[in-house]
């Protein structure tokens, strides 16, 4: 896959504080990774729906966009410089993490997991049930 070199540097370089992100995203039941060339972005999806998106903003800053609840995200935006209303997506439903700025790992892990949970909650029941079976029996 031809990932953008700058985005790759922040996510996949073992010196990066954020090198855990791809593994965490892919550890979630039913999650897949894909590179969307037309967006020059790495997408993490569950049942076809995006829960995480790695891209650059117009200034070339690497970002991780995550689905979020505005009530939960707003205090985090105020507390951490690395977190802000999402770039190029609904500011009401998405948060951006600047990958070139620091944010505590436990906060990032929580935001990724919460993003996944919000997306899964919006899936039809049949698809949610399938993901529940996958999480309890990953060999299915």
Regions found by a protein language model. Give the residues of each.
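Charge-dense, helix-prone N-terminal extensions
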Residues: 2-140
């Amino acid at each position: 896959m031809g990932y953008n070199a700058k985005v790759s540097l922040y996510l996949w370089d073992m010196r990066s504080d954020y090198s855990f992100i791809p593994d965490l995203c892919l550890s979630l039941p039913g999650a897949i990774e894909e590179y969307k060339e037309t967006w020059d972005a790495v997408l993490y999806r569950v049942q076809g729906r995006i829960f995480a998106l790695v891209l650059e903003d117009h200034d070339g800053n690497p970002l991780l966009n995550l689905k979020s609840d505005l009530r939960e995200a707003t205090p985090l935006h105020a507390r951490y410089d690395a977190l802000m209303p999402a770039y190029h997506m609904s500011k009401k439903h998405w948060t951006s993490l600047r990958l070139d700025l620091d944010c505590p790992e436990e906060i990032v892990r929580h935001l990724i997991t919460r993003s996944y949970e919000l997306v899964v909650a919006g899936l039809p029941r049949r698809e949610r049930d399938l993901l529940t079976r996958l999480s309890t029996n990953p060999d299915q």
